[in-house]
């Protein structure tokens, strides 16, 4: 049943996520991830995980030599196949198929809430990061008042038009996809990594 609901939704999801008020908020999140970066910050290799159509690519302030994307969806693979600026590799959502200490920076935006074993996956990401490298994480405020109000608005006014699914199916999608709360994820990160900078927006 879940596969039936998600069939052919990837493209609609990406276009909807970056349009209207929701799009403004998502773009703001991407800008904030780059707030302390500039062209003087050069990274040889950057990896973005769960990039979808890679909207963060357009907000990059730092310079780099290679931009890699690790994705699980067929839509992303098809979307980037003719893009010479990125190197996309499809993976199983658990094991990153790269050698240890490969990347100078790893970006993961609004993805950890979807992963069943987030602590293990964070350790997997860290193993691919070079010593002294940067791991940039963006998390949604789910649960949270603003998040819940936004979700209610989408369910009541846009979900049928955008996805052609019911409000109940939309709630089911979110329940099965957002398996980690931000409170749990932040606690895991704070406990394991003391040398980190945290900003709320």
Language-model region placement:
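Residues at the starts of beta-strands that form the adenosine-phosphate
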Residues: 45, 65-66, 134
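A short SAM/SAH-binding and catalytic strip from SAM-dependent methyltransferases
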Residues: 105-116
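S-adenosyl-L-methionine-dependent methyltransferase catalytic module, highlighting the catalytic core
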Residues: 4-24, 116-127, 134-201
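Conserved alpha-helix/loop element of class I SAM-dependent methyltransferases that forms part
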Residues: 23-43
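Conserved class I S-adenosyl-L-methionine
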Residues: 42-52
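A short acidic, Gly/Pro-enriched loop at the edge of an enzyme's catalytic core
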Residues: 94-106
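Class I SAM-dependent methyltransferase SAM/SAH-binding core
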Residues: 52-95
């Amino acid at each position: 049943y879940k596969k039936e609901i998600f069939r052919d939704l990837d493209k609609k999801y990406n276009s909807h996520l970056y349009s209207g008020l929701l799009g403004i908020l998502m773009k703001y999140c991407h800008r904030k991830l780059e707030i302390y970066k500039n062209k003087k910050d050069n990274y040889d290799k950057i990896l973005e995980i769960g990039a979808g159509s890679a909207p963060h690519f357009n907000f990059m302030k730092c310079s780099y030599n290679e931009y890699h994307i690790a994705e699980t969806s067929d839509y992303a693979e098809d979307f980037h196949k003719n893009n010479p600026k990125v190197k996309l590799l499809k993976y199983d959502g658990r094991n990153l198929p790269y050698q240890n200490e490969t990347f100078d920076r790893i970006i993961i935006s609004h993805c950890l809430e979807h992963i069943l074993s987030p602590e293990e996956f964070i350790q997997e990401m860290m193993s691919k990061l070079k010593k002294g490298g940067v791991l940039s994480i963006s998390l949604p405020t789910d649960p949270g008042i603003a998040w819940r109000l936004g979700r209610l608005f989408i369910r009541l006014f846009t979900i049928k038009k955008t996805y052609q699914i019911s409000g109940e199916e939309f709630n089911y999608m979110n329940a099965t996809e957002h398996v980690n709360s931000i409170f749990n994820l932040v606690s895991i990160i704070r406990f394991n990594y003391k040398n980190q900078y945290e900003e709320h927006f």
